[in-house]
Amino acid sequence: MTSKIQNPNLAALSAAGVSVWLDDLSRDRLQSGNLQKLIDTKSVVGVTTNPSIFQKAFANGHAYDAQIAELAKRGANVDVTVRTVTTDDVRHACDVLACEWEASHGKDGRVSIEVDPRLAHDTDKTIAQAVELWRIVDHPNLFIKIPATKAGLPAITAVLAEGISVNVTLIFSVQRHREVIDAYLAGIEKAAEAGRDLSKIVSVASFFVSRVDTEIDKRLEKLGSEQALALRGQAGVANARLAYAAYQKAFEGGQRYQTLMARGAQVQRPLWASTGVKNPDYADTLYVTELVAPNTVNTMPETTIDAVADHGVIRGDTISGTTLSSQKVFDSLVAVGVDLIDVFAVLEHEGVQKFVKSWNELLKETQEQLDSVAK
């Protein structure tokens, strides 16, 4: 029986209004009881997955071999095999997190599964697959992850209108975050027109943090001036803080949301993603301790959860009151010559391509396993 004594640092983070989610899932993690242990001792109340996470899970060890062999004997093709295996893991994780879902009235206890990343620029196919995944997993604490591409935005609205909960992923800019909020509100308005229970439709907006620093720092180093170099390591946090200000404007003061709230609609919480620190010169808890505010989620790899548990200093709300200083960071970036429009375009393109590459590798490796069973 796992002890249910929560780590004090992570408990403090939760008490400050930040839901701690694990950015990882594998069958080994489920079967070993590790996910349950993280729930019981590290305040974890949700799970996010993506194509890269599943590709690594399949590649490491043999936890999936027996199921893939069984599917091969039944004549399943590679797409069906991958979808069956991944949705089984997600369904199992939904069961593990059911208590957290109930205790939070549906806000937490969520498990995210992403639509095929190859559909990132196809609205209709994204909608169709989102509906299919929702049907296959068939758990109310599921999130369907849809990327915040231009084609993804109308898909988000359409899927929410069907009463399906959505995790919007690959958001890099505050402007795109505003468009995501609009897509969410439009979807909830359509759901209201259809007579759906708005309190049951939940969404988060996954705003990527460390990748912004990685891309902008690279450009600052290329520029090389003293002013440029002094700005390294500031953009990721400042960008996320400005995204939180956009959230506050829409949901804490926006009339459009107030009308929907009266009918039971929930806010679309910002979720800080890509919070594992990639630069060893920066504190390994940077994207956690500097992004504390009510009604947020931080999804972290286990190494980051462990770092916060060990030495993360939670100082309460570190976002409120930072809008002007955060905007100043971006004004300074423009002043030294950083092309922010290009930065965010590159990040979105690379984000989609990384997931496509992982998905293709997953399909290739699974096809090889299917072929070996057939021989």
From Swiss-Prot:
PROSITE patterns, A to Z: TRANSALDOLASE_1 (PS01054), TRANSALDOLASE_2 (PS00958)
A GO-annotated cellular component: cytoplasm
CDD domains assigned to the protein according to its UniProt record, in alphabetical order: Transaldolase_like
Signal peptide: none
Cellular localization per UniProt: Cytoplasm
MF-aspect GO terms: transaldolase activity
Protein name: Transaldolase
Source species of the chain: Mycobacterium leprae (strain TN)
